[in-house]
């Protein structure tokens, strides 16, 4: 197998596997602390998390494609401009999602079926998620950018750091 392929794919596979474990870790901590109602609440709120992550991943993937394209054409100035614009878009999107979802969260949670104690817990969980929305957009988006500039190991490290922070914050907040 091609050494370059392994160098880039193995860290990406590890990072994607760890990203998939975020929900499992949330479920373990919250399930132990809040029981079935807590698990129901994070499942109700999950589309909010998915939307924030998708926004970051989409921006980062688009930026990484443009960056790689300009680098391939030896247009360094344009490539650098794409990186700057992508970072600005992360910032704008993270703040916009915080504001819009913050305003709409109660309606969304009701639309998703939350009632009673599940609504209350889902609202609390969503507030925490929204407070970190800017970091989540940047965190999800920087991964494809790092991969496109040949830093797939750094992308994996960013994912691992995010997972450790996630475990630490959830552990402190819910145990």
Predicted regions and their residues:
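Short alpha-helical transmembrane segments in multi-pass integral membrane proteins
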Residues: 1-9, 67-134, 172-174
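Interfacial/gating helices of multi-pass transporter permease domains
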Residues: 30-50, 117-121
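Residue-level recognition of transmembrane alpha-helices
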Residues: 9, 16, 43-46, 90, ...
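Alpha-helical transmembrane segments of multi-pass membrane transporters
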Residues: 101, 154-173
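Transmembrane alpha-helix boundary and packing residues in multipass membrane permease domains
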Residues: 12, 16, 28, 65, ...
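Cytoplasmic helix-loop-helix junction between adjacent transmembrane helices
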Residues: 114-122, 126-127, 133-160
């Amino acid at each position: 197998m091609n050494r370059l392929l392994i160098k880039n794919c193995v860290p990406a596979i590890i990072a994607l596997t760890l990203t998939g474990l975020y929900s499992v870790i949330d479920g373990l901590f919250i399930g132990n602390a809040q029981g079935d109602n807590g698990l129901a609440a994070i499942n109700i709120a999950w589309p909010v998390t998915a939307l924030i992550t998708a926004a970051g991943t989409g921006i980062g993937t688009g930026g990484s494609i443009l960056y790689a394209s300009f680098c391939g054409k030896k247009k360094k100035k344009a490539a650098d401009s794409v990186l700057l614009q992508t970072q600005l878009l992360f910032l704008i999107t993270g703040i916009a999602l915080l504001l819009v979802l913050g305003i709409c969260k109660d309606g969304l949670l009701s639309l998703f079926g939350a009632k009673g104690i599940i609504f209350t817990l889902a609202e609390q969980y969503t507030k925490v998620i929204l407070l970190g929305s800017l970091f989540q957009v940047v965190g999800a988006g920087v991964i494809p950018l790092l991969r496109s500039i040949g830093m797939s190991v750094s992308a994996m490290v960013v994912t691992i750091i995010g997972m450790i922070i996630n475990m630490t914050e959830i552990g402190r907040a819910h145990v």
